[in-house]
Amino acid sequence: MERRGFRILGMLALAVFLTVGCEKQPEPEPEPPTPPEKKELTPTSGDLAPTDVPDYDKIHMNSEFYKSSREGNVTGTFYDPLKSSSLYYFGRSRQSEHFIIFWDKDYGTTYPDDAASPYHLDTKAFLDWCEEIYKYYVNTLKFIHLNTGEKSYLDQYKFQVFLWHDTTWAAYGSGPEDNITGCLWVNPEAANSRATVAHEIGHSFQYQVACDLILNKKATDIWQTAFRYDQGNGSDFWEQTAQWMAYQMVPEETFTNYNFGEFCDNAHRHFAHEDMRYGSYFFHYYWVDKYGLDAVSRVWHTALKPKDSIESYMSTFSLTLDEFNAQVYDYAARVATWDFEQIKAEGARHAGAVSWKGVDAGAGWWKVDPSKAPEATGFNLIRLSVRPGQELTMDFAGMPNAPGYNKSGDAKQAGWTLGFVSLGEDLSTRKYSESTIATAATNNYGTAQWTVPADAKYVWAVVACTPTVYITHLWDENNANDRHWPYQVKFTADGEVLDLGAPSSGGLNGGGAGSNFSWTLSGTTISVDVDIDTDEAVRQGQFILGYFDLPVAKVNAFLGTDVRKLDENSFYGVNADGSKIPEFTSYKPGMWVDINEKPCTWDKGTAFWQWYIWGGKKDKSGSVITYDGDQGGTGANQGRFVVGINPGNVAAAKGKTLVFRNKILAHGAEYDLVITYRYH
């Protein structure tokens, strides 16, 4: 590296020293030496000698070199990577400090760097990213124990990447059959996705943990380790952990990937449920807040058959079941606002995203809907409309083995933990109540009380499922045998019963903040007024979203018909002058309008968008399909209205008031649905 700049700085420092006096000037920090770049082999058709290959002794000759085709079986024939005829050949490779990438022989003499799309890959940038991942997973997360007195195969060998000349998506991180070093198999499309690479290398590290446990005689074989030991038909812990590891590297995707919605729709299920194995990565954030950034890797290093991930976690940190159950509740309460150190700032903008459904049981009581009945380690979050200073009470009655739900099993094992959480208008102030426990010993009853904090803008009730024994969940792809622990609740504020069937609103990707609304039913008109704070709105894809829910039962009573049975021809938009808008410009029934309330298409200067669902959900074409119980918290009891703003028009939206005028045709009569949106 050129050092002329340092000579000049040194002369200036000397001049200052002679002018000012004897005060010693600090020496500049020496820059670390730049490691020499590894020799890059030019693609060639000739055979090579080991001396032609940089770090030849760091490349383990694993079972991949006993294959004649990409997805073929391991054979008894060794296809020497020194020979150009082999599937993988050192003449078609590139190395960095801890990785080597081979591209298969279908690339011929063309570097992936020079190949046209879809076979193109910048191998230098790819290896740089791999090295960045390696450094974080080793030095910070401590998945591999180097220079600690323990042995690791990574002391001797490099990770290997095998790039397939293929357009079919391929991304597989793990290892070959010999249990020595982790590998990654990818096609160019997958290799160009930073999050995918971080996720799959996470699997490679999980495999490496297993290999090193065997090397250090802490496991007898790989089937004893968390990498191979299944809970039923698979192990959710693989995917949960790989997702969390990936979002350590690409934190901007923590809340924007579709797996976030998967978790929000399934948080009532067991932590280890297969339906959310790609989305259930938030407990990991709780672990590292409690025990440090290496907490997750510590669990992986101690997770051995027959313990599942939770049992291993409890064992690693010497937790009793009561202590663990207290953590489950604390974790659930924090999920309401995503109050975890690494993600809390952005998380508050997604507050309340976890969905809940209730069924009116009469006399102010609401039963949890079977589609949201909690399982062990699962939880529910219930948004409440209350004011600061009110005395809030939750009366709770557990209903183990109640009809209409999956069987709970032994009712003596029943347990729930209850409480409240609030978020301030500043989206940073969180307050938590004390928790209350209901078990078979209390006849499954419990009461939680709280004075709503003066700074509370949004409030949720928390119901965490905390049985008195730990219940393992087996991956069997059969939700019918999942053990439900149903309950019913009644809420009062200053002694007045809260109506959970009243409208609810949200603006932060399915939940708590960013919008407020009111509504009235009068004559033949449903009037809704919505206030949206564009500064608090959340981007979801290309849109900034808000929503509100209207209770179907009350709308049905007003219309005299079941609105859920009306088809799209029963709805149409109306211009300000009362004329009919001839067709929908968005999902049916839905409308794009410009800043002047004129209907338009999404690409014609669009600023605003609205569509709505009555007890159903939309497929990608916009058609109404049967409600399946898990669409953003709405369904048989709610009609959801979603409003979007094109992000390019947010500035134009501020200060504007737009009115969406709609007609509903029901049993031969016309009703008006007028929704006024105020953006500020």
Language model feature labels by segment:
Residues 18-21:
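C-terminal motif of bacterial Sec signal peptides marking the signal peptidase cleavage site
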Residues 25-77, 81-83, 510-564:
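Acidic/polar, low-complexity intrinsically disordered N-terminal segments immediately downstream
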Residues 42-181, 188-201, 205-215, 413-419, ...:
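Zn2+-dependent metallopeptidase catalytic core
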Residues 179-254, 258-261:
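Zinc-dependent metallopeptidase catalytic helix centered on the HExxH motif
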Residues 262-329, 333-337:
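Active-site-proximal alpha-helical
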Residues 307-520, 524:
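Beta/coil-rich, acidic/histidine-enriched accessory regions frequently appended to metallopeptidases
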Residues 381-384, 512-613, 670:
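Solvent-exposed, low-complexity, repeat-rich "mucin-like" stalks and linkers
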Residues 543, 654-666:
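A short beta-strand micro-motif common to beta-rich folds, especially ectodomain repeats
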